[in-house]
């Protein structure tokens, strides 16, 4: 884990201090030699004493214990263990600084513990010391001086060369502690101690040091930064007398407690600050919590030996040190000069120093382990566990992933500052330009994200330096899709040379670089899985393989199309499926046209898109009005059947919003509901051709269903929800007459363009609807045919539109839905001026008899071209543009649910 940025400077100072106090390699080798020589000599002394004791017993017994047979069974092993337990000297252990790896420069005092079967005595100490001198001469040529310290229950060995090391061997026995516990429990001891037994407290201290070493190796050695911080603080305890009482076991416990309770691994600087915070909080104060000793059965305070003044001094010193660290003066706490802000890069050491383990463990005097070794090839293991273990080994054996250009550059030039120069492009496809200054030269590059732009900059810098960019090792062969993707991106940096797309795209797996470029699309800009599904339904994608660790998964998916199998790989199953589908498309449909092959039914011509957004010709745009319904307009290339009227495709039940007169709704060019089986593919494929009058359908200009438009429009009672079905080709040549340049169109619903053109608003149809000024109501269009209430009886908006579902669907509106269907019994008489309204070219009452029922509407209105008003009492009006909804291509809006 990367260290936190705010502690980077502290980390540098702590590590620099640590390097200065860490022993040199020569010192560590001298310690290693002295310890290993002593261990081997003590092993020889143990053997010698054991032989002497066995010599007093029977020879056969000695043979059984000394030379077990080769085909020794577990029973034999148990005998050997028992024989080991009966030895006078049971083993030698490393303790203190040597065992914990806390040696610093100048630490010359080393410690070992010699475990005895019985309580150690002065006689035993003399015997061991005498024979140790003899055995050392056989083990090594180095000269050692051996001293006996009966008061300390120890033997001291000193070397005669530099550095002058001193090794103390403490004699002790577990029996000492066992007897002490019995005494504390109130038991009486039946065995009397020999008169020359060594000091019990010294023996107990040696046993405690053994427990401390084991605990430290189990808890602190594996804790990141813990050993480093302890070494640095040991140096602080030496330099600052106030900290002296903490040196040793209390300091080790304090550091483990402070660092081990953090919720994440910490760098050396942050870990040191956490220890200072722990001390500054008053943990060692008399009323503080103290430091619990985990190696004692009874609750023991490891700092119980400190007096009140020492505790206060340590706390005050820690608080001062913490303030210095907070103000960036940690170097004063460490007793060193401040480091420059930019450290020179040290050459990489081929043999990095392992700061955790200073001296390798001993194998000389190894006691039979209490735990049996793990059997690697044990047959009792379950096959699944074996398989997982093999997979893990294989994963570890795999070479690490090659570094990308950014990582490589950061290794060569650490601390580079990347700057965002600009961000251009639309919101959905931004282009970021990043720059970096290296050795006085500035490099810039762009990309679809800041991360990619930084990567491109790094590639540029490495290429300028003549160094590998890290991309060469990747798969150089890319499919056409990835090539086109890269073409669509801004070409900023010349990437490494890429081999042209191979002929078999199914074998091409995209590199990681292409997956960062964005979504995987076909050359038609679609999702490959979706496009392949349009061509071949019901395909099944199967997972072939899953490799890599949890952080770097690799999936391979396979799909079978027309008997051929195609594979794709990616960092997740979705990406792998996309590449498999892409490979199939490239191979099987290399030249597939953009238009969908699924909808090949014959469609009638469809008008161009209209409305305020797509006004192709000068006409008054309006929501729901649609564009000019001229049948000569070619159909758009890719019409979808369900849509928000105005756009080519959409979702939602045909809200004819701002729609072109093909409506985009259910009646697209005769392929509306007709293509779904609701009605035939006729021009009036609306709701069962609801007003396609057989007689008047094809009249010139204003004929049949909607004057020149010929397309039926069904408007539901939501705003602009019109369903328009464009006209058949036979009307293509018959342009309805109209006034001005307005191409006739007809309203399909919500007319919100009142300000632009309101040929007849509510006031004009005041006799049929409520006077509503500029009401933008539902279906309010021309003259407020806002009654979306054909299925309700809503006289308010439509002048009493009485709609009854009889066999004939008699729509007898006394206002013709007030402009909505502006024909009605003596009601909506209007003149469309240049273009006659609905119905036959000759006036009179026209009854539209659709296949599903006739709308009997007495629409007395003039023929196209005549500017006379309809026979209506109140609401006759003249409109040169005529048009039932601002353009005179009338779509008769029947709003019934």
Curated annotation (Swiss-Prot):
UniProt PTM comment: Phosphorylated at Thr-188 and Thr-315 by PKR in response to RNA viruses. This phosphorylation results in the dissociation of ILF2 from the ILF2-ILF3 complex resulting in a cytoplasmic sequestration of ILF3 where it can bind to viral RNAs and impede viral replication.
One GO MF term: double-stranded RNA binding
Cell compartments where the protein resides: Nucleus, Nucleolus; Cytoplasm; Nucleus
Any Gene Ontology biological process: defense response to virus
Composition skew (Gly residues), residue ranges: 644-662, 813-822, 834-844
Positions of the DZF domain: 5-378
CDD domains: DSRM_ILF3_rpt1 (cd19910), DSRM_ILF3_rpt2 (cd19912)
Modified residues (N6-acetyllysine): 100, 460
Renumbered ranges of motif Bipartite nuclear localization signal: 371-389
Its job: RNA-binding protein that plays an essential role in the biogenesis of circular RNAs (circRNAs) which are produced by back-splicing circularization of pre-mRNAs. Within the nucleus, promotes circRNAs processing by stabilizing the regulatory elements residing in the flanking introns of the circularized exons. Plays thereby a role in the back-splicing of a subset of circRNAs. As a consequence, participates in a wide range of transcriptional and post-transcriptional processes. Binds to poly-U elements and AU-rich elements (AREs) in the 3'-UTR of target mRNAs.
Quaternary structure (record): Identified in a IGF2BP1-dependent mRNP granule complex containing untranslated mRNAs. Interacts with FUS and SMN. Interacts (via C-terminus) with PRMT1. Forms a complex with ILF2. Can also bind to PRKDC/XRCC7: this may stabilize the interaction of PRKDC/XRCC7 and the heterodimeric complex of XRCC6/KU70 and XRCC5/KU80. Forms a heteromeric complex with ZNF346 and ILF3. Found in a nuclear export complex with XPO5, ILF3, Ran and double-stranded RNA or double-stranded minihelix VA1 RNA. Found in a nuclear export complex with XPO5, RAN, ILF3, ZNF346 and double-stranded RNA.
The name this protein goes by in its record: Interleukin enhancer-binding factor 3
Organism: Rattus norvegicus (Rat)
Phylogenetic placement of the source organism: Eukaryota, Metazoa, Chordata, Craniata, Vertebrata
């Amino acid at each position: 884990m990367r260290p936190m940025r705010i502690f980077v400077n502290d980390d540098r100072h702590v590590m620099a201090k640590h390097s200065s106090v860490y022993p040199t390699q020569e010192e560590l080798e001298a310690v290693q030699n002295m310890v290993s020589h002593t261990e081997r000599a003590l092993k020889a002394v143990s053997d010698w004493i054991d032989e002497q004791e066995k010599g007093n017993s029977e020879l056969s017994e000695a043979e059984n214990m000394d030379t077990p047979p080769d085909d020794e069974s577990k029973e034999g092993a148990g005998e050997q263990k028992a024989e080991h337990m009966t030895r006078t000297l049971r083993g030698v252990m490393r303790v203190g600084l040597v065992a914990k790896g806390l040696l610093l420069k100048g630490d010359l005092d080393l410690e070992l513990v010699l475990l005895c079967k019985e309580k150690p005595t002065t006689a035993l100490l003399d015997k061991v010391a005498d024979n140790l001198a003899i055995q050392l001469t056989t083990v090594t040529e180095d000269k050692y001086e051996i001293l006996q310290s009966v008061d300390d229950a120890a033997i001291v060995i000193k070397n005669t060369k530099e550095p002058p090391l001193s090794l103390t061997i403490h004699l002790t026995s577990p029996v000492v502690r066992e007897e002490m516990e019995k005494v504390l429990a109130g038991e009486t001891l039946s065995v009397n101690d020999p008169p020359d037994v060594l000091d019990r407290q010294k023996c107990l201290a040696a046993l405690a040091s053994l427990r401390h070493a084991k605990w430290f190796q189990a808890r602190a050695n594996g804790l990141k930064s813990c050993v480093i911080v302890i070494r640095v603080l040991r140096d602080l305890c030496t330099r600052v007398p106030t900290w002296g009482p903490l040196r040793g076991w209390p300091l080790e416990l304090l550091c483990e407690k402070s660092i081990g309770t953090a919720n994440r691994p910490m760098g050396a600087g942050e870990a040191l600050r956490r220890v200072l915070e722990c001390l500054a909080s008053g943990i060692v104060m008399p009323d503080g919590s103290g430091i619990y000793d985990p190696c004692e059965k009874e609750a023991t305070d490891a700092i119980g030996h400190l007096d009140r003044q020492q505790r206060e001094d340590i706390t005050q010193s820690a608080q001062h040190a913490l303030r210095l660290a907070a103000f960036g003066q940690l170097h004063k706490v460490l007793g060193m000069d401040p480091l420059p802000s930019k450290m020179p890069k040290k050459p990489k050491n081929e043999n990095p120093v392992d700061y955790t383990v200073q001296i390798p463990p001993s194998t000389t005097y190894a006691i039979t382990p209490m735990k049996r070794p793990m059997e690697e090839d044990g047959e009792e293991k379950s096959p699944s566990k074996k398989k997982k273990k093999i997979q893990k080994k294989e994963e570890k054996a795999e070479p690490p992933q090659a570094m990308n250009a950014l990582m490589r550059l950061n290794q060569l030039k650490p601390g580079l500052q990347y700057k965002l120069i600009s961000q251009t492009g639309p919101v959905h496809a931004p282009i970021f330009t990043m720059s970096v200054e290296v050795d006085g030269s500035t490099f810039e590059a762009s990309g679809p994200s800041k991360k990619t732009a930084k990567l491109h900059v790094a590639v540029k810098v490495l290429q300028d330096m003549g160094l590998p960019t890290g991309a060469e090792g990747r798969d150089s062969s890319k499919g056409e899709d990835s090539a086109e993707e890269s073409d669509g991106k801004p070409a900023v940096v010349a990437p490494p040379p890429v081999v042209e797309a191979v002929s078999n795209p199914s074998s091409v797996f995209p590199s990681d670089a292409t997956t960062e470029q964005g979504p995987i699309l076909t050359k038609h800009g679609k999702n490959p899985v979706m496009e392949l599904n349009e061509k071949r339904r019901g395909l099944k994608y199967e997972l072939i393989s899953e490799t890599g660790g949890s952080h770097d998964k690799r999936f391979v998916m396979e799909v079978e199309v027309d008997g051929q199998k195609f594979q794709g790989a990616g960092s997740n199953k979705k990406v792998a499926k996309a590449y498999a589908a892409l490979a199939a498309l490239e191979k099987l449909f290399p030249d597939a046209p953009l238009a969908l092959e699924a909808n090949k039914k014959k469609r009638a011509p469809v008008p161009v898109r209209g409305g305020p957004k797509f006004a192709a010709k000068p006409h008054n745009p309006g929501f729901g009005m649609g564009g000019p319904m001229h049948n000569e307009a070619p159909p758009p290339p890719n019409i979808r059947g369900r849509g928000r009227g105005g756009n080519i495709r959409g979702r939602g039940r045909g809200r004819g919003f701002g729609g072109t007169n093909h409506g985009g709704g259910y009646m697209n060019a005769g392929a509306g509901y007709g293509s779904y089986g609701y009605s035939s593919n006729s021009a009036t494929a609306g709701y069962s051709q609801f007003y396609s009058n057989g007689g008047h359908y094809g009249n010139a200009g204003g004929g049949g269903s909607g004057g020149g438009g010929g397309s039926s429009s069904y408007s539901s009672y939501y705003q602009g929800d019109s369903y328009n079905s464009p006209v058949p080709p036979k009307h293509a040549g018959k342009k309805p007459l109209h006034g001005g340049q307005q191409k006739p169109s007809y309203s399909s619903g919500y007319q919100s363009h009142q300000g632009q053109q309101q040929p007849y608003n509510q006031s004009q149809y005041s006799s049929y609807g409520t006077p509503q000024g500029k009401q933008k109501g539902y279906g309010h269009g021309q003259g407020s045919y806002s009654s979306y209430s054909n299925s309700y009886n809503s006289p308010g908006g439509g002048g009493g539109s009485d709609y009854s579902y009889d066999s004939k669907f008699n729509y007898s509106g006394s206002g013709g839905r007030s402009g909505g269907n502006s024909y009605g019994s003596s009601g909506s008489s209007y003149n469309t001026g240049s273009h006659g309204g609905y119905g036959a070219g000759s006036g009179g009452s026209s009854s539209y008899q659709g296949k599903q029922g006739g709308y009997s509407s007495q629409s007395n209105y003039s023929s196209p071209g005549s500017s006379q008003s309809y026979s209506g009492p109140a609401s006759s009006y003249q409109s040169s543009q005529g048009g039932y909804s601002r353009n005179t291509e009338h779509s008769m809006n029947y709003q019934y649910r």
